[in-house]
Amino acid sequence: MGNQHSLLNKEQLEQMKDNSSFSEAELKKLYRRFQMLDKDGSGTLTTDEFLSIPDLALNPLLERVIQIFDQNKDNEIEFFEFVGTLATLSHKGTKEDKLKFLFQIYDIDCDGFISNGELFQVLKMMVGTNLNDVQLQQIVDKTIIEGDYDKDGKISFDEFIHMIGNQEGIEEKLSVNWSE
């Protein structure tokens, strides 16, 4: 099965070039990396294959990141999904796209809002046992109160942008150099 995925055809390359900020040479390089990560040669990446990357394996939000990569929600990352997310996180990605990606990390149920419970879950992933649940809930409550401008009990994307969009260096913090 892995053989049928060994080459990108010209049409696929052109489509990905049109839909991303990557050149043909960059796409070919990314495809070679993708194939190296695809240990079983299936043409897709599984969570376990992502976890085999030492730098990513330690990331407490890796499961959420993988869920966002997996746009069609089939529990596998196809190359086009891989490219789409990497394009967002590359230095060529727009600030708005990067902030949408970050918002998606917190918006676990994909309803367009960050609820108190979702914020708690994501922060719990990040802090682990460094804070107890009461301390963490206090931070969550304070964040929701400060960021919920329309007072509906949740954070919309616009409110999220208002809260963090103007932080100095946010775009750089959400950029990864994939060309190395």
UniProtKB/Swiss-Prot annotation:
Family matches, as InterPro entries: EF-hand-dom_pair (IPR011992), EF_Hand_1_Ca_BS (IPR018247), EF_hand_dom (IPR002048)
Gene Ontology BP terms: calcineurin-mediated signaling; positive regulation of sorocarp stalk cell differentiation; response to cation stress
SMART domains the UniProt entry points to: EFh
Stored Pfam families: EF-hand_7
List of residues binding Ca(2+) 3: 107, 109, 111, 118
Every EF-hand domain range: 25-60, 62-92, 94-129, 135-170
A GO cellular component entry from the record: calcineurin complex
UniProt keyword annotations, A-Z: Calcium, Lipoprotein, Metal-binding, Myristate, Repeat
Lipid group attachment sites (N-myristoyl glycine): 2
SUPFAM superfamilies: EF-hand
GO MF annotation list: calcium ion binding; calcium-dependent protein serine/threonine phosphatase regulator activity; phosphatase binding; protein phosphatase binding
Chain residues that bind Ca(2+) 4: 148, 150, 152, 154, 159
Record site feature (Interaction with PxVP motif in substrates of the catalytic subunit), residues: 125
Entry binding sites for Ca(2+) 2: 70, 72, 74, 76, 81
Region (canA/calcineurin A binding): 138-143
Superkingdom of this protein's organism: Eukaryota
Binding-site list for Ca(2+) 1: 38, 40, 42, 44, 49
Assembly notes: Forms a complex composed of a calmodulin-dependent catalytic subunit canA (also known as calcineurin A) and a regulatory Ca(2+)-binding subunit cnbA (also known as calcineurin B).
Miscellaneous comment as given in the Swiss-Prot or TrEMBL entry: Amoeba with reduced cnbA levels produce smaller stalk cells and smaller stalks due to incomplete vacuolization of stalk cells.
PANTHER family reported for this sequence: PROTEIN PHOSPATASE 3 REGULATORY SUBUNIT B ALPHA ISOFORM TYPE 1
Function: Regulatory subunit of calcineurin, a calcium-dependent, calmodulin stimulated protein phosphatase. Confers calcium sensitivity. Important for stalk formation.
Similarity section: Belongs to the calcineurin regulatory subunit family.
Protein name: Calcineurin subunit B type 1
Originating species: Dictyostelium discoideum
Lineage of origin: Eukaryota, Amoebozoa, Evosea, Eumycetozoa, Dictyostelia
